[in-house]
Amino acid sequence: MKTPRLPIAIQQAVMRSLRDALARANLKLGRNYPEPKLVYQQRGTAAGTAWLESYEIRLNPVLLMENQQAFIDEVVPHELAHLLVWKHFGRVPPHGKEWKWMMESVLGVPARRTHQFELDSVRANTFPYRCRCQQHQLTIRRHNRVVRGETQYRCVRCGDTLVAEN
């Protein structure tokens, strides 16, 4: 799928959100943490990721185009919180008490771990598999591992090995 070209107005709104959240955090923490790099190259179903070592936030441009306000209000602060926690506390669990504190007490945003965005536009092709109790959809990566004989997948409900449907 071709990555959409993000209008400059959306990029500016995202940058404003990032800078506002960072300024709030720096004020409350009494620090002067630098501005992270923003990259619009996140793929798949993740809305965004925080890359600690390179101190950058990667955002999914497809989901951003479809959920602009939620990205500005929630996703940007969520990823920024990961970077700030890493700078402030070092390596800690990604959605642990430090991250929750950073989100709620410092950034003033509800600490939600996952998004609820519609994913049809970014969901990869899947392959139908079956067990005793239900149908499953495997990603192309998992399907190829089964085809090459590298692995078998089991249903968590009934324990059956999944078999490709024709």
From Swiss-Prot:
Gene Ontology terms for molecular function: zinc ion binding
GO terms under biological process: response to stress
The cross-references to InterPro entries, in alphabetical order and at most eight, read:
SprT-like_domain, SprT_Zn_ribbon, Uncharacterised_SprT
Q: Which UniProt keywords apply?
A: Cytoplasm, Metal-binding, Zinc
Chief localization: cytoplasm
User: Which residues are named in the active-site annotation?
Assistant: E79
Q: Please report the name of this protein according to its UniProt entry.
A: Protein SprT
Tell me the classification of the organism that encodes this protein. Answer: Bacteria, Pseudomonadati, Pseudomonadota, Gammaproteobacteria, Enterobacterales
